């Protein structure tokens, strides 16, 4: 190593140590001027010797090349959301269920719920290689370059391990105030709260903008099975993350009873204004992994954790108007237009009125002073009216008799609270149906946003979803803010969607009561759109998990001549009409996975956890996250922990990875 290489290595080491002390430990060991001087020296050396730039160099934090967009990434392990508690009764019920399942010998770990943006960080051999947003929990967006600008995120860990961690990126209150002051001076729109500011900063295409926003982070979990790192619980995991160099929130506490949990909540309800960052609640988790495994998961969240949300904030403001929108199924939804008001750190100008019955029951009128509540709900609610402040000339609000978009007569189906427009030619319904068709969970056509869809309809370029596949670059470049490159990308994305497996098309058709799961089940069972269209209600309800409502809705939809005509046109332009997944034909005795409940634990070498799960599910098995008496088989990789021990205790059959591969090869 020559003198320059040695100095660059020395500067990297010093700057990492100083940065860790400043941003993670909050205990600076040198003056800012000293740090800046060393950083500038390193920048100069790297500019003169670009081949000597380390991948984890502190200079990589200042922001790199502007990107064209964020690519989608699938999380190795889903980023599940938590169930919510809004009062002491909710927490008591959670505690009762936990004790009923695992007894009284356990403890909780209570942590502050940071009000920011959930992120996932991947490290290979100790080096930060990828960062992503939570997205929908399964698929997020890669924002590695922007996350590198957060000084609290280590670019190299203290051990050369491969690991994925989860955390919350946030904007400190002081950074938020400074940013909004700058935006006010520049005549720019202000951010409503630090959470929005953090999310907006991390979605900037230019990392230099993110770098200027002074974000920070707390890391609170390992993605996947923490036991493979020799950890047996959540509190120990947080200590382990700190030892690796990650910032974790120190304001946490182990509690033995729900009364201790409530005391912790009361303390931070009172003291949250004194924190340097925003919090919106407290997260409560059962500590030991073995007990977490015993409690298991619901479809959406773990049974061993809950998020207590601070009490709803209520404010009063004036109802200026009631806006009526028409959805893809024709439902007319009323929304309150309000004098802007701050609620729970957010500027609120619109609030949900749900339906005609709520407006009538609460006698909500234009000009009223109304009570707005916002808690765990994303959408604020109108919860009451101050009758004593009502204007003298007010009159009861009447829902219209006709559609606000197409003027067709509105109807109310028996048993429903909603008014509906049943005109299939209604502009709003067509627009919303096409937006749904192209959405991520359906045909997933990137670049075809709401405004583009509306422009295409108004330009008379499309009338239904089949027309999308006839669009040309020449037509698209005539649209507002649509250049040739964007038009080319959009046409390519539309054409690529033709190759989707049939279940995506079935989702995109927007058939009532038919969601993602039902669409996949029906597609797998029948194999082709033609077969589904010919199916009877009796054939459909005979399928496991397809109920009467779904079956009736499918038959009704496909008996409509207009719907069948659209599907025929889609087929004519080349949209795939068959199921592309593997249809399992189970032969008793030939397949050891079919109908079995299986748990994967430990580290697999020949397959990833997701690959193993997919293969087992293709063969009719169900993969769960916890071991119980209902488990048929546990497949244990290296460093398997409490799940393996519990399987042996319960006498459940256990395979190693070689057994799994051997059986897969026999099928």
Swiss-Prot record:
DNA ligase that catalyzes the formation of phosphodiester linkages between 5'-phosphoryl and 3'-hydroxyl groups in double-stranded DNA using NAD as a coenzyme and as the energy source for the reaction. It is essential for DNA replication and repair of damaged DNA. GO terms for molecular function: DNA binding; DNA ligase (NAD+) activity; metal ion binding. The gene is ligA. One of its GO terms (biological process) is DNA repair. Keywords: DNA damage, DNA repair, DNA replication, Ligase, Magnesium, Manganese, Metal-binding, NAD, Zinc. It is an enzyme of class 6 (ligase). Its EC number is 6.5.1.2. GO terms for cellular component: cytosol. It comes from Lysinibacillus sphaericus (strain C3-41). This is DNA ligase. HAMAP family: DNA_ligase_A. It catalyses: NAD(+) + (deoxyribonucleotide)n-3'-hydroxyl + 5'-phospho-(deoxyribonucleotide)m = (deoxyribonucleotide)n+m + AMP + beta-nicotinamide D-nucleotide. The keyword Manganese applies. Gene3D superfamilies: 5' to 3' exonuclease, C-terminal subdomain, 6.20.10.30, BRCT domain, DNA ligase/mRNA capping enzyme, Helix hairpin bin, Nucleic acid-binding proteins.
């Amino acid at each position: 190593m020559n003198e320059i290489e040695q100095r660059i290595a020395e500067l990297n080491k010093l700057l990492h140590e100083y940065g860790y002390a400043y941003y993670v430990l909050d205990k600076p060991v040198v003056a800012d001027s000293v740090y800046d001087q060393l950083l500038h020296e390193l920048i100069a050396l790297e500019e003169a010797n670009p081949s000597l730039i380390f991948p984890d160099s502190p200079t990589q934090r200042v922001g790199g090349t502007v990107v064209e967009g964020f690519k989608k990434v699938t999380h190795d392990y889903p980023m599940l959301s938590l169930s919510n508690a809004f009062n002491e009764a909710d927490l008591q019920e959670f505690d009762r269920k936990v004790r009923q399942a695992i007894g009284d010998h356990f403890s909780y770990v209570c942590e502050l719920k940071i009000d920011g943006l959930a992120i996932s960080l991947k490290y290979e051999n100790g080096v930060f290689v990828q960062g992503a947003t939570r997205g929908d929990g399964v698929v997020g967006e890669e924002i590695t370059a922007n996350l590198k600008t957060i000084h609290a995120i280590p670019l190299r860990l203290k051990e050369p391990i491969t690991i994925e961690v989860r955390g919350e990126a946030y904007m400190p209150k002081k950074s938020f105030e400074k940013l909004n002051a700058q935006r006010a001076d520049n005549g720019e729109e202000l951010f409503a709260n630090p959470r929005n500011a953090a999310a907006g900063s991390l979605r900037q295409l230019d990392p230099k903008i993110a770098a200027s926003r002074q974000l920070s982070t707390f890391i609170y979990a390992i993605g996947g099975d923490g036991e493979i790192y020799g950890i047996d619980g959540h509190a120990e995991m947080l200590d382990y993350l700190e030892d690796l160099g990650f910032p974790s929130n120190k304001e946490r506490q182990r509690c033995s009873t729900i009364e201790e949990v409530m005391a912790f909540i009361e303390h931070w309800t009172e003291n949250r204004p004194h924190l340097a960052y925003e919090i919106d609640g407290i997260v409560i988790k059962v500590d030991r992994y073995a007990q977490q495994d015993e409690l298991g998961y619901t479809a959406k969240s773990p049974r061993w954790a809950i998020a207590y949300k601070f009490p709803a904030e209520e404010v009063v403001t004036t109802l200026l108007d009631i806006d009526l929108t028409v959805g893809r199924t024709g439902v007319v939804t009323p929304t309150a237009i309000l004098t802007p008001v701050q609620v729970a750190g957010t500027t609120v100008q619109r609030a949900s009125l749900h339906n005609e019955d709520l407006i009538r029951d609460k006698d909500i009128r234009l000009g009223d002073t109304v009570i707005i509540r916002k808690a765990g709900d994303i959408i604020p609610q109108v919860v009451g009216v101050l009758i004593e402040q009502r204007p003298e000339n007010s009159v009861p609000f009447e829902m219209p008799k006709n559609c606000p978009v197409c003027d067709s007569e509105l109807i109310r189906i028996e048993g429903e609270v909603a008014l509906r427009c049943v005109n299939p030619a209604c502009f709003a319904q067509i627009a919303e149906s096409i937006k749904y068709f192209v959405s991520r969970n359906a045909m997933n056509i990137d670049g075809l946003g709401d405004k583009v869809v509306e422009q295409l309809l108004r330009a008379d370029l499309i009338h239904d979803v089949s027309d999308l596949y006839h669009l040309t670059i020449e037509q698209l470049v005539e649209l507002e803010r649509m250049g040739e490159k964007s038009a080319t990308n959009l046409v390519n994305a539309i054409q690529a969607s033709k190759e989707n497996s049939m279940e995506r098309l079935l989702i995109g058709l927007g058939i009532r009561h038919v969601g993602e799961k039902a669409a996949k089940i029906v597609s797998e069972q029948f194999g082709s759109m033609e077969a589904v269209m010919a199916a009877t209600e009796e054939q459909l309800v005979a399928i496991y998990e397809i109920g009467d409502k779904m079956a009736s809705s499918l038959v009704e939809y496909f008996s409509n001549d207009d719907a069948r005509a659209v599907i025929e046109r889609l087929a004519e332009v080349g949209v795939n009409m068959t199921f592309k997944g593997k249809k399992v034909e189970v032969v008793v005795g030939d397949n050891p996975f079919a109908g079995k409940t299986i748990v994967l634990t430990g580290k697999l070498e020949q397959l990833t956890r997701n690959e193993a799960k997919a293969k087992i599910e293709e063969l009719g098995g169900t993969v769960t996250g916890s071991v119980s008496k209902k488990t048929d088989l546990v497949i244990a990789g290296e460093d398997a922990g409490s799940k393996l021990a519990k399987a042996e205790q319960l006498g459940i059959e256990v395979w190693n990875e070689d057994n799994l591969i051997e059986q897969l090869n026999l099928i």
